A protein has these predicted regions:
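Active-site flanking residues adjacent to catalytic metal/cofactor-binding acidic residues
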Residues: 73
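Catalytic cores of Mg2+-dependent Asp-rich isoprenoid enzymes
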Residues: 1-65, 76-209
Length: 209
């Protein structure tokens, strides 16, 4: 969004509300999910109108899920660069300001807000799972390309829920070893729809703290 084009370390600019965050996640990544759904339906397979609408709805939320996870993971770095994607109206409800997120000791106070967005990210990610599970059985390459980010997203959300994201000395990141393991699992699972569903779930994951 244009509001972040002129940021500097002396000033932290935040999104105002939930609508602006949703607009941002759509413009950066939800629109990408929409675009690739268009490409998939134009070149890979045909579906009826109901299935088409389901794919577009879930494809948009697929993209939003990955961007929201990135936002949650990168909060300290973004704040240090003068950008706060956590809506100001949400922070004010808990007597917080963007600059307070530079202090890892404020995590307990920030946790209710943070967990609410982890839950939202899980809900979006469940739509990503729905998108993959809607693919025809012969689309194993497409399944593989989607399973990978879903599993990395699930692992990242688990780590975010268990750690202090405001601690810049200990950044939250899925290890290379785990990514290699996820790659192998994704490759094997993508061969069939049944294996895929067993690995990534059936879009009913619920975040509970």
């Amino acid at each position: 969004m244009e509001r972040f084009d002129v940021t500097n370390k002396e000033e932290i600019i935040a999104l105002n509300n939930e609508d602006e965050l949703d607009e941002y996640t759509y413009s950066v990544a939800g629109s990408v999910g929409e675009f690739w759904t268009h490409m998939t339906l134009d070149h890979q397979f045909e579906v009826d109108n109901e299935m088409r609408n389901n794919l577009f709805e879930n494809g948009i939320r697929f993209g939003k899920s990955l961007q929201l996870i990135n936002i949650l993971r990168d909060i300290p770095e973004d704040i240090a660069m003068g950008r706060c994607y956590m809506p100001m109206e949400k922070l004010l409800q808990y007597d917080l300001e963007p600059k307070d997120l530079l202090d890892s000791n404020n995590m307990d106070k920030f946790r209710p807000i943070f967990d609410s967005y982890i839950s939202k990210a899980y809900n979006h990610l469940n739509c990503a799972i729905k998108w993959v599970n809607l693919l025809p059985k012969n689309q194993y390459r497409l399944r593989f390309s989607c399973i990978l980010p879903i599993l990395i997203g699930q692992s990242t959300l688990k780590m975010l829920s268990e750690n202090n994201v405001l601690d810049r000395e200990n950044p939250i990141k899925v290890s290379r070893k785990e990514i290699k393991s996820i790659f192998r699992k994704s490759l094997f699972a993508s061969i069939t729809k049944n294996r895929t569903s067993k690995l990534i779930g059936k879009s009913d994951i619920i975040f509970e703290k």
